[in-house]
Design a protein with these regions (language model features):
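Residue-level signature of outer-membrane beta-barrel architecture
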Residues: 109, 146-149, 207, 264-267, ...
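Repeated loop/turn-to-beta-strand initiation elements of outer-membrane beta-barrel proteins
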Residues: 114, 152-156, 211-215, 269-273, ...
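Outer-membrane beta-barrel translocator/channel fold
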Residues: 166-197, 315-324, 345-365, 375-406
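Surface-exposed coil loops of outer-membrane beta-barrel proteins
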Residues: 169-302
């Protein structure tokens, strides 16, 4: 089944606009590369209406900033603005507007507001059981964005995101029951793959169409389509969890996509959007930009009834996402609800991954981060997933689906380092529930633990 075909005149115009976005995104990457390595972006509180000459509201979207500084002045932001029903997650996704603040670098330069966030995360993990392994590694991310008015109720946002995780082994790091993508032509099992150098190079234009409502167009050579909740690196509910979810390829594996165009309508309490994008996941060559194409599609509706809540439902038809299953497409249905305030962030999500042809594999996720006082943080994640990729070809259990549950809990203590930086020290442990048929491969009761030090520009 293919997505609906656009008339040739409309299609030509979209492709022309998409090429322009790629040029703009490339210029943005060179212009706004500054010290920032971003994960926990949530941008609640920046009232674009406070910026000189700007009537930017992105549908009353706030970015959690102090009032704009004087040109050339650097600042941090730390106020929570509960008046905005939503904040920005990854791509065009929304998260609760009152999830709490984060710090970051902000500079005014003429009409431009430049923003930077990021982290370098030193991690050691020891995944137990017969198929476990241990590894010391560094995760990293850098994000820089730039915004300015274009006049006549239009605004431009340039977005870039980078990672040095390609320096990691192609096999990534140990993560029991995680699957997806390849290393040296072999499917990754019980491993989490590294991210690409280029995680986002995109631009977004918002145009006022009614009081409190905008139409927007987002796209670029690297971006994220309108599918699933905000990616796990951008959810405050997982801000100190150093392990990727084992359900990553059910919910947010499209967060690095080579070729994306998204159009939508955004208002204070809802957003409706549709995307065309490349379905194939990134290959093993993590340093370059793969050839963009638009062979897949998705739609997403998001509801933000108050600053504390954000809910989304989305569906995508993905063309041949996995290199080792070249003849399989995927129909992915996701639904999620997020809650946030200045102390607590929670995400609950469901996904049904329909292999075409093949079975429907479902997954559930519940994760939270609680900041009871000061720098103390308690976090946890529970995942339940039906996975048929736990055994490679040639093994008797290859292709058989097993439902497994991962239960993880951890603690982190954040130490402020001046106004802009912070250091979080912590760790987590994980237990698993699985069918007895997996005892021979994984052991009866595998246990994993992780320790980390996370240096952040912003938080």
């Amino acid at each position: 089944m293919e997505g609906p075909r656009l008339p040739d005149c409309v299609s030509d115009r979209i492709f022309t606009m998409n090429r322009r976005y790629w040029r703009v995104a490339a210029i943005a990457a060179a212009t706004i590369s500054m010290p920032a390595m971003a994960q926990d972006m949530d941008h609640n509180g920046m009232d674009h209406g406070q910026m000189d000459g700007m009537s930017m509201d992105h549908g009353q979207m706030n970015h959690d900033m102090t009032p704009a500084p004087s040109p050339g002045e650097e600042t941090e932001h730390h106020e929570v603005n509960d008046s905005s029903p939503f904040a920005t997650g990854s791509g065009t996704a929304r998260v609760p507007g009152a999830e709490g603040s984060m710090h970051g670098l902000h500079i005014m330069s003429g009409d431009w507001m430049l923003m930077a966030h990021g982290y370098a995360w030193g991690v050691y993990t020891d995944q137990g059981g017969a198929r476990g392994d241990d590894k010391a590694y560094v995760q990293s991310m850098l994000m820089a964005t730039a915004e300015r008015p274009l006049g006549d109720g239009a605004r431009l946002t340039l977005k870039s995101m980078f990672s040095l995780e390609p320096l990691m082994s192609a096999r990534g790091y140990p993560n029991l029951f995680a699957t997806g993508e390849t290393a040296n032509g072999i499917g990754l099992i019980d491993r989490q793959h590294p991210h690409d150098l280029f995680m986002e190079l995109a631009a977004r234009i918002d145009v006022d169409i009614a009081p409190g409502a905008t139409a927007f167009l987002y796209g670029g050579p690297v971006g994220e389509p309108a599918l699933g909740p905000s990616a796990f690196m951008m959810r405050r509910s997982s801000r100190y969890n150093a392990e990727a979810p084992i359900t990553h390829h059910w919910f947010d594996s499209t967060h690095i996509t080579y070729g994306v165009v998204t159009a939508g309508v955004s208002a204070s309490r809802f957003q409706i959007e549709a995307s065309a994008f490349r379905g194939r996941e990134p290959d093993e060559e993590r340093w370059g930009i793969e050839t963009p194409k638009l062979d897949s599609w998705s739609v997403r509706g998001t509801w933000t009834p108050s600053p504390n809540w954000a809910a989304q439902v989305s569906y995508g038809r993905i063309k041949s996402p996995e290199a080792l299953h070249d003849d399989e497409d995927e129909g992915r249905l996701t639904a999620s609800i997020g809650y946030g305030d200045d102390r607590l962030s929670v995400t609950g999500a469901f996904s049904a991954k329909n292999r075409l042809p093949g079975p429907v594999l479902t997954a559930w996720l519940l994760e939270a981060n609680w900041n009871p006082t000061g720098g103390h943080n308690l976090f946890g994640r529970v995942e339940n997933v039906e996975n048929d990729e736990l055994f490679p070809e040639g093994e008797p259990l290859h292709g058989q689906a097993f439902r497994v549950t991962k239960m993880q809990a951890g603690y982190a203590y954040r130490i402020p380092l001046g106004k802009l930086f912070g250091l979080a020290l912590g760790g987590s442990g994980a237990l698993y529930d699985k069918p007895r048929a997996l005892d021979a491969a994984y052991g009866k009761s595998p246990f994993g633990w992780t320790a980390f030090a996370k240096l952040s520009l912003g938080d």
